[in-house]
Regions:
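N-terminal secretory signal peptides that target proteins for export/translocation
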Residues: 1-5
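Bacterial N-terminal signal peptides
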Residues: 9-20
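Active-site-adjacent loops and short helices of periplasmic peptidoglycan-processing enzymes
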Residues: 24-178, 185-190, 206
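Domain-terminus/edge residues, biased toward the C-terminal soluble/receptor-binding domains
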Residues: 157-161, 169-386
Length: 386
């Protein structure tokens, strides 16, 4: 699996959407969490952030990276839910009942199916299960951590480093609120066949029943995942996703003082995100949003369109909102193919980016004749590219 970013350079195409502006000030939000982000799932845009890129101890939320590696191996048929892994002495001592942490209570040298280990990690946050998966898949936790870091890099997590599968404290293990939101978005988008496990209310194994540690799943506010975490040093944290009104949000909060504060702050943030924004239809499917210059093309420019309708989520009652810029890496060079992603629409409210929508070439543009190429070359030489 290879996931690549799309580098863009700013171009001065400013779109005026002032007719949609409201008359009041956008609702402010604050949280007791030390670190927090609220991400729009569709666009990946942060609707709220507090220390989003500051390194923090991820605690058991690091298990989401473990789960991502397992999901990836399952999807690529390199691993089966029916495979069985041993519970090693390391898994038993570090993550078993005697460790005092979250555990599935697996016995030393027993064999457990991947399906049970995976559910234990997701629902119960079992440390022994996470270690057993890591050792069974990679031979050792350090080797598995290398797989975690490789995948993290591929999906665009730029501020994280993992050294174990459990999230147990280590000075060299860290992540950021933004990275954990990126990870949650990847899990939801890439693995729909497995994502429903996060919403399972409980898991029973070997006659031991344990409830989902993510209490928000049972709150009736649309939360269907993902993971909680806690250590004495880092405090209480959570990564949650909720879907309401046809829109999915991802929230990450960390550094709170108690389980009850964690649940309440997460509830407040996702509720604010659900109720504090409104949908504004802007461009129907196929409507040209802007034009991009094509250097040496048969046509001097190409129209940029979205895929489907472009609707904006903006804070209710915001002033100076929305305005937008179109950015693309240009000038483009032919041939340009219809449907090729070439830019993005960046929407601002009160000078804060609230939505990013990919834009695609509306038509093909072939290479122009020698006269067109010479003309564009002269223009670039004398004037720079406008």
């Amino acid at each position: 699996m290879h996931v690549r970013g799309f580098g863009l350079s700013l171009v001065g195409l400013l779109l005026s959407l002032a007719l949609l502006a409201g008359a009041a000030t956008a609702q402010e939000f604050d949280t007791k969490a030390k670190f927090a982000v609220l991400m729009d799932y569709e666009s990946g845009t942060l609707l709220f952030s507090k220390e989003p890129d500051t390194a923090m101890e991820p605690a058991s939320m690091a298990k989401l990276m473990t789960v991502a590696v397992v999901f990836d191996e399952l999807q690529r048929k390199k691993l089966s839910m029916d495979d069985e892994f041993f519970i090693s002495e390391h898994a038993w001592k570090e993550g078993g009942a005697s460790s005092g942490g979250s555990t599935m209570f697996a016995e030393l040298n027993s064999k457990v199916k991947v399906s049970d280990l995976l559910r234990s990690v997701i629902v119960q946050s079992g440390n022994d299960a996470a270690i057993a998966l890591a050792e069974g898949m990679a031979g050792s936790e350090p080797t598995f951590a290398g797989m975690m870091n490789q995948l993290a890099t591929e999906i665009g997590m730029t501020g994280s480093n993992f050294v174990n599968s459990t999230g147990l404290p280590d000075p060299n293990q860290y992540s950021t609120a933004r990275d954990l939101a990126v990870l949650a978005r990847f899990l939801i988008a890439q693995f729909p066949e497995y994502y429903s496990i996060f919403a399972e209310p409980e898991f029973t194994w070997n006659k031991i029943r344990q409830e989902n540690r993510n209490s928000l799943v049972e709150m009736g506010i649309g939360v269907d995942g993902l993971k909680t975490g806690h250590t004495e040093a880092a405090g209480y944290g959570t990564v949650v996703s909720t879907k309401a009104g046809g829109r999915r949000l991802i929230a990450v909060l960390h550094g709170m003082k108690s389980m009850s504060e964690r649940a309440e702050e997460a509830r407040k943030l996702v509720t604010w995100g659900t109720r504090g924004f409104e949908l504004i239809p802007v461009y129907p499917d196929g409507k040209v949003v802007a034009f991009a210059n094509v250097y040496g093309g048969k046509e001097p420019e190409v129209g940029l369109v979205g895929k489907g309708n472009i609707d904006l989520f903006v804070p209710k009652g915001a002033t100076n909102c929305p305005t937008a810029t179109v950015t693309y890496k240009g000038p483009l060079r032919p041939p340009v193919k219809a449907g090729q992603q070439v830019g993005q629409l960046n929407v601002f409210c009160n000078d804060v980016v609230v939505q990013v929508t990919p834009l695609y070439a509306a038509t093909d543009v072939e290479q122009g004749d020698i006269v067109r190429q010479a003309s564009d070359a002269l223009k670039q030489l004398l004037l720079g590219w406008l």
